[in-house]
Swiss-Prot record:
CDD domains: GATase1_IGP_Synthase
Protein name as annotated: Imidazole glycerol phosphate synthase subunit hisH
Matching InterPro entries: Class_I_gatase-like, GATASE, Imidazole-glycPsynth_HisH
A single GO molecular function term of this UniProt record: glutaminase activity
Gene that encodes it: hisH
Oligomeric form and interacting partners: Heterodimer of hisH and hisF.
Cellular localization per UniProt: Plastid, Cyanelle
Entry keywords, A to Z: Amino-acid biosynthesis, Cyanelle, Glutamine amidotransferase, Histidine biosynthesis, Hydrolase, Lyase, Plastid
Pathway given in the UniProt record: Amino-acid biosynthesis; L-histidine biosynthesis; L-histidine from 5-phospho-alpha-D-ribose 1-diphosphate: step 5/9
Amino acid sequence: MINSKNNSPIEISIIDYQMGNLYSVCKGIERSGGIPKIINSAEEIKKATALILPGVGSFDPAMKQLKKQDLINPIKDAISEKKPFLGICLGLHLLFEESEEGIESGLGILSGSVKRIKNEPEITIPHMGWNQLQLTNPKCYLWDGLTKYPWVYFVHSYFAQPKNPNVIAAAVTHGTQQVTAAIQYENISAVQFHPEKSASIGLHMLNNFVQQSCN
């Protein structure tokens, strides 16, 4: 178990907005030295010290659910307060302004949009399975202690396209297309792949997030 500066265990709050199974994320945090806490209210987000926004599903239903639970402004406030924040899969997409997958506006925390992977004769969509990361920002704390080209597990048909390419922390190649696999901007980290399903490499990344939440 990883402890904070005051020697208390590190609690990682996982936002439940009814978009995906949270069990594997919780187990990943447990195995990475943190204490997972599932939260679903504005007040809980306000009290949280570190946050994960996971998600499996589609862009529009996710944004509608965040609105229904009145979580949009609390998430924005938490990020502006510099709380450690990790988005996973759909949780990465929602940080941006819009998506080709729907008509709802995203959180708009990062400038850019979400695009669909283009069809090619030799690839399948969704991009599903193990693939190697290209670490475009090797200084990103998530990669601390990892090899140069780690293998991680993907399941997605869409990818984020930031207006500022400097926020891209890793990319992945599917067919002839190189797409965003992770972003890092100030206290915001987000990954397209599933670290909780990426064996020891993914657990190492989650451990790095828990460690970052101590600071």
